[in-house]
Regions:
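Cell-envelope/extracellular polymer assembly enzymes that use nucleotide-activated donors
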Residues: 3-5, 38
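Short, well-formed alpha-helical segments that are part of the catalytic scaffolds
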Residues: 13-30
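Donor nucleotide-sugar binding loop of glycosyltransferases
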Residues: 13-16, 46, 101
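Short helix-capping segments at alpha-helix termini
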Residues: 28-34, 58-63
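Short beta-strand/loop segment that forms part of the nucleotide-sugar
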Residues: 33-45, 67-68
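Conserved donor nucleotide-binding strand/loop of the catalytic core
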Residues: 40, 51-80, 84-85
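A conserved acidic beta->alpha catalytic loop
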Residues: 43-51, 98-99
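Acceptor/aglycone-binding surface of glycosyltransferases and processive sugar-polymer synthases
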Residues: 69-71, 75-85, 90-93, 99-158
Length: 158
């Protein structure tokens, strides 16, 4: 059985780790029951109780795992360390605050099963302020023109 690893880096996400855990496990169990899975939280030395909540989630569900950093390694290094620890055939990285819609997990897995090695989600619309969305679009276009490397506009980075 193929295994999906969902990696969720977090820092001070006490309000979100419980809800995102429930949402991800529900999607995986209902829509992708043919796969084994692990949900791995990598905590970046949170100070708001996030760690205790994650420990409770791990105690309740053996498929939920925790990596608890001894210090804050930053938003880029921490997910990398998480990638070194996961055991799945497919990796989906998400942020804890629902910026990445959990409803897209089945679509990502479907595209991966077609043979794609990397599947990336991009924003085509946003609930954020229109001015901020426009400014972000201008930023992406500027970076795209200045860069020698092909850029993906509105790539969330997760």
């Amino acid at each position: 059985m193929k295994k999906i690893s969902v990696l969720i880096p977090c820092y001070n996400e006490a309000e979100n780790v419980g809800p995102i855990s429930r949402a991800v496990t529900e999607i995986l169990e209902k829509e992708l029951p043919q796969y084994d899975y692990e949900l791995v939280f990598i905590d970046n030395d949170s100070t708001d109780g996030t760690r205790d909540i994650i420990r409770g989630l791990c105690a309740d569900n053996p498929r939920i795992k925790a990596i608890l950093n001894a210090r804050n390694f930053g938003q880029f290094n921490s997910p990398y360390y998480g990638m070194l620890q996961i055991t799945g055939d497919c990796v989906i990285e998400m942020v804890a605050d629902f910026q990445d819609p959990v409803e897209l997990i089945p679509q990502y897995v479907h595209e991966w099963e077609k043979g794609y090695k990397i599947v990336i989600g991009i924003k085509t619309s946003s609930k954020e302020n229109r001015l901020m969305y426009w400014l972000r679009s201008c930023y992406y276009k500027t970076i795209k023109k200045l860069s020698d490397v092909e850029q993906i506009e509105h790539f969330t980075g997760s």
